[in-house]
Amino acid sequence: RLRISVADKVCGDYGGRNMKSFLIIGLGRFGRHMAQKLIEAGHEVLAVEISEERADAAVDIVPQILIGDATDERFMSTIGVKNFDMAVVAISENFQQVLEITVLLEDLGCKYTVARATREVHKKLLLRNGADHVIYAEKEIAERLAMRYGADNIFDYVELTGDIGIYEIGLPIKWKGES
C-alpha cells in the first residue's frame, strides 16, 4: 500500500503535538467517543450534558463534565466558551436544540463550532447560523465506505473539500522496489 498524505501541509503540526481545548456538548455515543479520542490524544476536554445519567455513565472517560442545559445563555456564559479552541455540538436527536446551541456559541464568541446534522437541510441551516463545519455522519460514512468498498485499489478515502481528497491506494506491482 502506498499512503500519500498532505496533512503536514494542511494542518501544520500534525500528530496532536499541540494541545487544544475542546468543549463537547452532548455525551451520547458520538460525543463520548469524540471526547475519549481527544483526551487520549492529550487535549483538554470539558463536556456539557443535560442528563445526569449520561454524565455519570461517561465520568470514567471524560473527567470534566458540567451538568446543565446548553441552550441556557446564563449557564453557557459561565463556561467561558470563547476560551476554547473548538466547540462540538454532538447532539443529533433534536435539531432545534442543535441550532439554538450553535447560534448561542457564536453569540458567546466561540472560535470554531462544529455541529452535527442528520439531514442535508439541517446542514445548510447550521452553516448559515454559526457553524464553521457540519458533520453529517451517516452520509459521510456511507460515502467513504462506498468509495472504499466500491473500488479495488482504494483502501481508504477522506474528502477535504468537494474536489480534493486524500486516498490510500494500492501500490502497482511495477512500482515495487522503486523510490
PLM regions: where:
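Cytosolic regulatory regions of ion transport systems
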Residues: A7-S179
